């Protein structure tokens, strides 16, 4: 049974198989989550990512995790040239990030709230799109058994909690278990 977890904290601190970076088309990691990943994990992550650029909007690529606790970084291209995003792009980026995670044999994956920081996408809409996409992908492939949403701030946490509730399997023995971790 796959587990979805909400975690209030820094994605860079998580010991998981892969963390997801909300990337731009060029894969530069200067601000937001990408900047934090580069700062904590080292420049090698960005160097490896940029060598694979440009990457189409909604696609995802994998790099080393450098000095991070995670084993890999999945760069989900969710920001266009103007550093904006949309619902279909967030959906595609999440699904492709899950596909890359399966390809590298990841059992645990951590996501931030894609597109809501630099991209300025509405938090509630992003949460619902992301949770639905993750649930769909977990239903398709049981190889990933733990997805963590690393969220910063009460607003993001509430939005993802509401999205989990809105998309929950009504059967008592549903295919997913949810857990909240507040730090």
Where are these regions (language model features)?
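Glycine-/small-residue-enriched capping loops at alpha/beta junctions
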Residues: 1-103
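Phosphate/ribose-phosphate-bearing ligand recognition and processing surfaces
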Residues: 81-183
């Amino acid at each position: 049974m796959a587990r979805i977890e909400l975690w209030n904290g820094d994605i860079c601190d998580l010991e998981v198989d892969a963390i997801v970076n909300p990337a731009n088309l060029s894969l530069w990691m200067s601000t937001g989550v990408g900047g934090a990943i580069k700062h904590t994990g080292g420049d090698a992550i960005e160097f490896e990512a940029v060598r694979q650029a440009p990457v189409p909007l909604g696609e995802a690529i994998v790099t080393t995790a450098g000095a991070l606790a995670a084993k890999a970084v999945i760069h989900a291209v969710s920001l266009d040239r103007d550093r904006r995003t949309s619902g279909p792009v967030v959906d595609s980026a999440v699904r492709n990030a899950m596909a890359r995670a399966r390809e590298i044999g990841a059992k645990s994956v951590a996501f931030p709230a894609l597109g809501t920081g630099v991209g300025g996408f509405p938090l509630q809409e992003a949460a619902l799109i992301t949770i639905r996409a993750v649930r769909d992908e977990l239903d398709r492939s049981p190889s990933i058994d733990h997805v963590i949403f690393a969220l910063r701030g009460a607003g993001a946490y509430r939005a993802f909690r509401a999205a989990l509730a809105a998309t929950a399997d009504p059967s008592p023995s549903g295919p997913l278990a949810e857990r909240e971790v507040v730090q």
